[in-house]
From Swiss-Prot:
Signal peptide: none annotated. HAMAP family: Ribosomal_uS8_B (MF_01302_B). Keywords: Ribonucleoprotein, Ribosomal protein, RNA-binding, rRNA-binding. Part of the 30S ribosomal subunit. Contacts proteins S5 and S12. This is Small ribosomal subunit protein uS8. It comes from the Bacteria. It comes from Maricaulis maris (strain MCS10) (Caulobacter maris). InterPro entries: Ribosomal_uS8, Ribosomal_uS8_CS, Ribosomal_uS8_sf.
Length: 132
């Protein structure tokens, strides 16, 4: 199956798994997905992830979702910059997601990072998604 937006596909898989209260979800592996998962893990939105290689050579990430008292830690995960419409922001214009209770994940010249890390590094970039 051809996927035009691999990151959007991963976010949709996570969103669907959370709606069904799944413990884990699998998604094909890529470098960008790994960096986004690193940010989600460091910010406490997922428990962990591991790379699994199948006999056919296909690599996937198994993402362990995080729940607190039966509710998912992620209440909303939304793709912002899409292949058809890229959204960029300078460091002064970085959005506050739910007044600072959520995060924006950015792709910057210094790598993929959260909005708070981007402010500390004084760098802007492409806003990949919002998580709250």
């Amino acid at each position: 199956m051809s996927v035009n937006d691999p990151l959007g596909d991963m976010l949709t898989r996570i969103r669907n798994a959370l709606m069904r209260n799944k413990r884990a979800v699998n998604t094909p592996a890529s470098a960008l997905r790994r960096r986004v998962l690193d940010v989600l893990k460091s910010e406490g939105y997922i428990r962990d992830y591991a790379e699994v290689e199948h006999a056919s050579g296909l690599k996937e990430f198994e993402i362990e979702l995080k729940y607190f008292e039966g509710d998912s830690v992620i209440s909303e995960i939304k793709r912002i910059s899409k292949p058809g419409r890229r959204v960029y922001s300078g460091v002064k214009d970085l959005p506050l997601v739910q007044n600072g209770l959520g995060i924006a994940i950015l792709s910057t010249p210094k790598g993929v990072m959260s909005d708070s890390t981007a402010r500390e590094s004084n760098v802007g970039g492409e806003i990949l998604c919002h998580v709250s």
